[in-house]
Amino acid sequence: MKRIIYSIYVDIPAAEHYGTTSKSKHDTTEKAEITVDAFKEHYDRLIKCKTVYADRIGVSFKMYEYDNQYKEFETKFKENYPEVTGYEIINFYKLHLLNELSQTYDEVLYLDFDVIPMNHSPNFFEEWDLSKGICVVEQNDKIVHHVEASQSIRSPTAKYYNCQAMLLDGGYHPNNDVINTGIIGASAEHI
């Protein structure tokens, strides 16, 4: 069985982390700069921990960065959706890559750049039966049901209600789960 782990690092400007639509007082450029700086400072270590993990469990690892493939994806995305931030484009790009890798690999594991597999972490592919579906963590417990509360555009609550609106607009039932896509495991048949 062919398996791969992949991650993405694109150094997007701090101002693009939240865009102009977030109303949360916590979504500041200063906060985003802390993240950007930490990624730069720990860049080598964040890649190494993933390559070590992949080697230990005997699977391939691929790191995607700001290259021509990403630039082409970003350009097309901005043409069609100019209101989308760089942060959001990366999130769509990781799903695009998940689909692309499923054409070559039987099972695929995506790890956000800040995910750190520990030395004692078990083999993800042996722990999770990906023949049963896509492996993600739901965050329904993080939904705030007080509509007066101000939410970040990236908060689980905003994602929940935005998804409800899209489902209703499409004529579907509005029930949905809030998913953390920082770690995604899937088999090619489910992608």
Predicted regions and their residues:
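N-terminal anchoring/stem segment of glycosyltransferases
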Residues: 1-93, 100-104
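Intrinsically disordered, low-complexity boundary segments flanking structured domains
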Residues: 47-51, 119-126, 170-173
